[in-house]
Each structure stands twice: as C-alpha cells, then as structure tokens.
From Swiss-Prot:
UniProt name for this protein: UDP-N-acetylmuramoylalanine--D-glutamate ligase
Subcellular location: Cytoplasm
Record family assignment: Belongs to the MurCDEF family.
Biological processes annotated in GO: cell division; cell wall organization; peptidoglycan biosynthetic process; regulation of cell shape
Pathway: Cell wall biogenesis; peptidoglycan biosynthesis
Organism: Trichlorobacter lovleyi (strain ATCC BAA-1151 / DSM 17278 / SZ) (Geobacter lovleyi)
Pfam family, one: Mur_ligase_M
Residues at which ATP binds: 115-121
EC top class, as a word: ligase
C-alpha cells in the first residue's frame, strides 16, 4: 500500500491515533490529526509527535478533512455511527481502523485474539509461548503497544500476536489473521452498541477475510460462538472443557489433548500456575494458536508451568483467618464473573459499580449455588439487588473498604472473598486498576 503524498486524516488522538499519525507521517503521507480535545488537554500528545510533518485540527473536526481525504484512520473510541464517518463513506473515502492499516504492512503470520473475556491473558500467554519456542514475536493490539508500531519499527519478526477488541474490528476491510481466535461472547458494551446482536456481529468480523488456508480457533462450549463458527471459511479448530474432539484441543482429567490431522499430543496440567476454569480455556486457546504455528509440546509445557496470572484477573491477595481473598477487578461483565464463580465455593462476592446495560440474570444459578453472601457497591447495587438479591444473603456497602471489612466479618473459615464486580469502575474509581489497588490495600489492613 503506497502512502506517500496521500491525504490522510487520523480521527482521535488516544494511543492508537498517535501511533497511526506517527506511522503515516513516517511513510510520507500528508497527515491531518484531529481531536475534539484542545491543545492544552493534548499537550503530552503534541510533544510526542513534535518534529513530524503533521497538521493538527484540535477542539473541533472539519468536514473537509474527512470528505476530501484519500484515507481516514479512526481510533477505536470513536463510535461507528459518528455523523462525520457516515459522510466520509458516502463521499467514497476509505475509512479504516488502526489494525486494518497495520495488517497491510505486516508480513509475519498474525494471530488475532478476541472475545468478551480472557483476551489479555490468552494474548500474553501466546506471545510468551512463541518466544519460549524461539520465535521472534511482537505482542500488541488492544494491550501494550498498538499493532501499527510493528511495521513502524521496521523490525522483522517471525510471529505477531494481537489482542483485538470489537471496536477495532468495526472498520476492517482486508484484515486477515493466519489464526483468529474467538474465546467467548457474553453481553458487554451495550452502552456502545444498539443491540447485543450488533456486538456479536462486530466480534465475528475477525474471521471475515480468512480462507481455507487459515485457522479459526473457537470455543466449542460457547453455543453462540460454536453456531456462528459453522459458516466460517477457515479451518475450524475448537477448544473445549466439556467435549472430546477429534480435531481440536480439549481437557480430560489431569491433561489437555491436542489433536490435529491424526496426531495427538498430551499436555499434563498438574504443574500449571494459572488456576480457574476460565484460565484452562485461555491456556487451550493459546496453545492451539501456537501449536498450529510451529510451537513444540515440551518447550510449551515448560513455559506453562511457570506462567503466572496477570494482575487483576482472579489474583490471590492473601489469606486471613482461613479465608482466602481474590481480586478480579478486570471482571467487568457477567461472563467473566461467571467463570470466577465456577472456580470457587463458599464465596462472599463483592460486586457492583457502574452499570453497563446488560442483564445480571445469567449469574442467578451460580449465585444461588456458590455465593453465601453478596456484598454490593456502586451505582449498580440497586439493580443487582433486584435481580440477584433474593438468591442469597445480600448486603450493601457505601465504599469498597466497608465492603471488604463486612466480607471479612461475614465469611466463615474455609471460605473465599472475591472481588468480581460485573461492572465498570468509573462511578467510584479512575479505572479498574485503582479499584483493584484499593481492594488489595483494604485486605492487607485486615
């Protein structure tokens, strides 16, 4: 793709927008970068891009920068139905996401991983598996560095692994991973999408341009994912905790079995550091992606036996008075909380925060079976109590610190206190990381 002298506009100057503008300028494009924030708010961004031939339009957008451009690159935070983008496409101008732009310049086999939950752990693990097996590997996308930083660096790599969000998939046209993985789909981001189906459709676009030469790694146990997978053009490679597979990877007592083209590999699970049923699925998905692209069993097993859980994903904090405390602040939707609840019994669950629009009803059975006490915080507390409060002993707390102390008082020896909110954090905290740190601090003060 030739970019030299092309009129390009980058909409939105968050992390991917900055990286895209830098790359386009390096390629010799005529770059306009535009953001609704003003110069003061973007001082750090402007210093990052200083010295590059970029024209900035700040505090507003000019329609002509879009409709008269050769190419518009949209940051994932910009809604797809933005009026300016509608006018741009009507004018016949190509609109792409940063991952679409990046993929046109990446020559290494690309592994792209999406799903409502587990993306970051699976992506990180896949990258570490490739590296342990001796492949020079770039890991980025929705975590760490934007995917466009790979071609921008000019560094040759043998494998690329990208975490991909539904937002990033909205503006693809030729994006084609060698291996695309869809881990699961549950209700999320209904504050962004007009319907659950629209969110599902966005996720499924990860497979859109694959052919029979590519692989689609999909969750056999997620009926929605599995049904959608039947119409894909790529070779299906499922993973499952519940089904034995003739082609795919599945768990059996004490081992994972990887079956591909008549060959079988057994991978013992006893030494895995990652715990929880959700992490077993993440491990299977990552292994599938990597074993399909040249990784070896022995080296991969060595890595799995030392790979630790990422922060804020069902992370053990400490044990006090024979009660274990786990922090799962990244669990901002019902699907991720369900996986956490499946991993424990005798739970005191701290949940709540800023409501994201989905139903909490899918948690009902697990709450009834496994949660002894439900401690609710934040804006969503009232609605969560309406949907789940009759299923177990339910309490409200004004602060997270109060919730931790209340949970300590309520939980019997042998039990588990789990922060797994099913909500975003923005009603009470800057982000999920601050919520996690406040929880950890409160637990350490017990």
């Amino acid at each position: 793709m030739e970019l030299r002298t092309k009129k390009t506009t980058v909409m939105g100057l968050a992390k991917t927008g900055v990286a895209s503008a830098r790359f386009l300028a390096q390629q010799g494009a005529r770059v306009t970068a535009t953001d609704m924030r003003d110069e003061t708010a973007l001082a750090t961004v402007l210093s990052e891009l200083a010295g590059l031939d970029i024209r900035f339009v700040l505090g507003h957008h000019d329609e002509a920068d879009f409709t008269a451009a050769d190419l518009v690159v949209v940051s994932p935070g910009v809604p797809q139905e933005h009026p300016l983008l509608r006018k741009t496409t009507e004018a016949g101008v190509a609109v792409v996401s940063e991952i679409e732009l990046a993929s046109r310049f990446i020559t290494a086999p690309l592994v792209a991983i999406t799903g409502t939950n587990g993306k970051t752990t699976t992506t990180t693990l896949a990258g570490e598996l490739f590296r342990a097996n001796g492949f020079s590997t770039y890991v980025g996308g929705n975590i760490g560095d934007p995917l466009i930083d790979l071609p921008a660096s000019g560094e040759p790599v043998e494998r690329a692994v990208a975490e991909i969000s539904s937002f990033q998939l909205e503006w693809i046209s030729s994006f084609r991973p060698k291996v695309a993985a869809l881990l699961n789909i549950t209700e999320d981001h209904l504050d962004r999408y007009p319907s659950y189906q629209a969110y599902i459709n966005a996720k499924l676009r990860i497979f859109e341009n694959q052919t029979a030469d590519d692989f689609a790694v999909v969750n056999r146990d997620d009926e929605l994912v599995w049904q959608a997978a039947q119409s894909l053009k790529a070779q299906l490679f499922p993973f499952s905790r519940r089904h034995e597979l003739t082609e795919g990877i599945f768990s059996r007592e004490g081992e994972l079995l990887f079956r591909h083209h008549g060959q079988e590999l057994s991978i013992p699970t006893a030494g895995f550091r990652l715990q929880g049923v959700h992490n077993l699925e993440n491990i299977m998905a990552a292994l599938a992606c990597c074993l399909l692209l040249g990784c070896q069993r022995e080296t991969s097993l060595e890595l799995l036996n030392r790979f630790e859980a990422l922060h804020h994903r069902m992370e053990f904090v400490r044990e006090v008075a024979d009660v274990r405390y786990f922090e799962d602040s990244k669990a901002t939707n019902v699907g991720s909380v369900a996986k956490a609840l499946e991993s424990f019994e005798n739970i005191t669950l701290i949940a709540g925060g800023k409501d994201k629009g989905g139903s909490y009803a899918p948690l009902a059975e697990l709450v009834q079976q496994r949660v002894r006490h439900l401690v609710l915080i934040g804006e969503a507390a009232e609605r969560m109590q309406q949907e789940l409060g009759d299923l177990t002993a339910t309490h409200k707390a004004a602060t997270l610190e109060e919730a931790v102390q209340l949970s300590a008082d309520l939980t019997a020896p042998g039990g588990v206190v789990l922060l797994s909110p099913a909500c975003s954090s923005f009603d009470m905290f800057k982000d999920y990381e601050e919520r996690a740190q406040r929880f950890i601090t409160a637990v350490k003060r017990l």
